[in-house]
Design a protein with these regions (language model features):
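Extreme N-terminal leader/activation tails
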Residues: 1-82, 102, 109-120
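Long, leucine- and charge-enriched amphipathic alpha-helices
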Residues: 85-109
Length: 120
């Protein structure tokens, strides 16, 4: 069984499985040439959508996170996307810990290398 997590995806499938990742205690999304904080990505979507984003958007990552989380209670679809990205990033981080430790499902051996296909 090939790893599903990688820090350097080489295919569309690999990029999809590793779209959201953690770095320096924050979550990033692979968008453009470099990774972008998921908070900044979602605030960019807010501006493009014409959301009533505060004129002075918070400058700290913590405040941006709180602002996006508060929008969930208003039914904001971008806040829902932010919540999904956050959840996906946490699940990927946990899976990466298992893979880094060499833990695989019973009856399987974990192989390093190109990501294999997965049957769901």
């Amino acid at each position: 069984m090939n790893r599903l997590t990688t820090d350097n995806p080489q295919s569309n499938f690999g990029t999809m499985l590793n779209m959201v990742y953690g770095k320096d205690g924050w979550q990033y999304i692979r968008h453009g040439d470099d990774g972008m904080l998921t908070t900044d990505f979602c605030l960019m979507l807010c501006k493009e959508r014409g959301c009533k984003v505060q004129d002075d958007v918070p400058t700290t990552n913590e405040a941006k996170d709180e602002m996006l989380c508060d929008c969930v209670f208003e039914g904001c679809p971008i806040a829902t996307i932010y919540a999904a990205l956050s959840g996906f990033g946490h699940v990927r981080a946990r899976l990466k810990m298992y893979e880094d430790a060499g833990i695989a499902p019973p009856g399987h051996t974990l192989k390093n290398g190109e990501l294999g296909s997965v049957q769901l």
